[in-house]
Amino acid sequence: MKVTFSQLKEAFNQVLLKRGVAAETADACADMFARTTESGVYSHGVNRFPRFIQQLDNGDIIPEAKPQRITSLGAIEQWDAQRSIGNLTAKKMMDRAMELASDHGIGLVALRNANHWMRGGSYGWQAAEKGYIGICWTNSIAVMPPWGAKECRIGTNPLIVAIPSTPITMVDMSMSMFSYGMLEVNRLAGRELPVDGGFDDEGNLTKEPGVIEKNRRILPMGYWKGSGLSIVLDMIATLLSNGSSVAEVTQENSDEYGVSQIFIAIEVDKLIDGATRDAKLQRIMDFITTAERADENVAVRLPGHEFTRLLEENRRDGITVDDSVWAKIQAL
């Protein structure tokens, strides 16, 4: 089915208001969920909203909580999220990283006791739109086996890197081949994954999203490389925030909350003039996109460039929402 941005935001807003969330907070949170969906990231927008409400109902998310600054060391700050709403707090932390970068050239905010930030790419994009390089990542509950194991002991720990090119170039990637949200998107659409995304119960690589969702044997991105990167991202986020590691979140909490996150902004224009910056970025992009195509019908793409097109399409044609997901939201 198709819905408009306004319909989607209003549906989110009403569910939040029904649960006693303050009007201003509910409006801001609903807006972020709707914008994520409008950008084409259904897995962490409309599809994720029922799960978000479940955690709100369980008390994992404290909607009235406000993040507090704990430590300030020039370009580096440490904050405690107080288990506040994840996407609103993440937006504030990237804003703060940009403020620090304006003073120091680079700003780093380490956040502990946070909730799921939904679409991590929103915060990298937020920085790139204002001319900064945006880098951020989060740890999570253990939802992926480390390389060589069958049991989940590491997080998917998504990493985002956004560059202020025209259009914005952005990598937003889980340390698994696919996020669990994308497994759900493909399962709901009745599609196999385009490449192997995990192991079946017999230990064979599989493209069946439902099998991987059930047995949790999701495949690390790049096999042992994604496994290793997940581990070191967790270590850095834990140390800089003095927060919880994947091990602590998994063993000590009843669900995925109280995670650790990193937000970095770099003010490029302190290091290079605007005309030179734009020319260098354009040369990089042109060099890549003019490569001979492996398939004449498929263009060479740069990461994140599809979001501008998806946004235009959804604004023009309406936002596609799975019927079963919409029914869940209407029932909340």
From Swiss-Prot:
Keywords: Cytoplasm, NAD, Oxidoreductase. Its main location: cytoplasm. Signal peptide: none annotated. It is an enzyme of class 1 (oxidoreductase). Pfam families: Ldh_2. Coiled coil: none annotated. One of its GO terms (cellular component) is cytoplasm. NAD(+) binds at residues 168-174, 224-225, 304-306. It comes from the Bacteria. Gene3D superfamilies: 1.10.1530.10, Hypothetical oxidoreductase yiak, domain 2, Hypothetical oxidoreductase yiak, domain 3. Its EC number is 1.1.1.130. It catalyses: 3-dehydro-L-gulonate + NAD(+) = 2,3-dioxo-L-gulonate + NADH + H(+); 3-dehydro-L-gulonate + NADP(+) = 2,3-dioxo-L-gulonate + NADPH + H(+). InterPro entries: Diketo_gul_Rdtase, Mal/L-sulf/L-lact_DH-like_ah, Mal/L-sulf/L-lact_DH-like_NADP, Mal/L-sulfo/L-lacto_DH-like_sf, Malate/L-lactate_DH-like. The active site is at 44 (proton donor). GO terms for molecular function: 3-dehydro-L-gulonate 2-dehydrogenase activity; NAD+ binding. It is found in: Cytoplasm. Catalyzes the reduction of 2,3-diketo-L-gulonate in the presence of NADH, to form 3-keto-L-gulonate. NCBIfam families: PRK13260.1. Belongs to the LDH2/MDH2 oxidoreductase family. DlgD subfamily. Homodimer. This is 2,3-diketo-L-gulonate reductase. It comes from Klebsiella pneumoniae (strain 342). The gene is dlgD.
